[in-house]
Amino acid sequence: MILQLHGGGYTGAVRNAYYVFAGLYNELSHGCNVLTPDYRVAPENPYPAALEDALASYRWLLSKGYYGEQIILAGDSAGGGLAMALCMYLRDHNMPVPGGIIAMSPWTDLTASGESYETNYEKDPLFGNTKESLIYQNDYPGEHDRMDPYISPLFGDFRGFPPMLIQVGSIEMLLSDSVSVAAKAREQGVKVRLSVYEGMFHVFQMAYLNIPESKKAWAEAGKFIDVLRTDSRL
């Protein structure tokens, strides 16, 4: 079972693109079911609404008989960060953690403190060259501290996490979010595969199978799922 948490900066609802993502996950996993909740978003529903809805979806899967290790959390951008935040919450509250996490260009640092926010500022075709993007103008945290690990997982503890696959483009401003999380998680004993795709932009996997880099990334995700299947009944 794959629980897919969509991106959109915590302000955009689920889009048709994520149904395509769901189909790809289903195909690459050789038939895994995929649940894509349309979680509440800001500004009407700031933190912790998205986390609460992700948790409710996970609890629903457990109520249907799935074990934690049978569930893979998958997410892109905000959804990737939300997947990590959910895993932290589950661990912190003694609930079953998932069997793995797939994070595509995860947004893990809502303080925008990473080096790549500066070095890729003029390179990033989506968020670059402006301070008016969702990276800087975002209502999700509300009155809460942006360094809260349930908002910015980078500042949390990754001990007890399952294996993670993290994919990111080399020219996106969120590059540091992935690199820093991978380094920290590895230091804390987590198995992490970090794949930096040269010349790629934020969530380039939305090109589906139409460009070589995206095709390779989806194939990598499929192989990661295959590895996890050897240790659980996905």
Question: Which residues make up each language-model segment?
Answer:
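Alpha/beta-hydrolase superfamily serine-hydrolase fold, recognizing
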Residues: 1-234
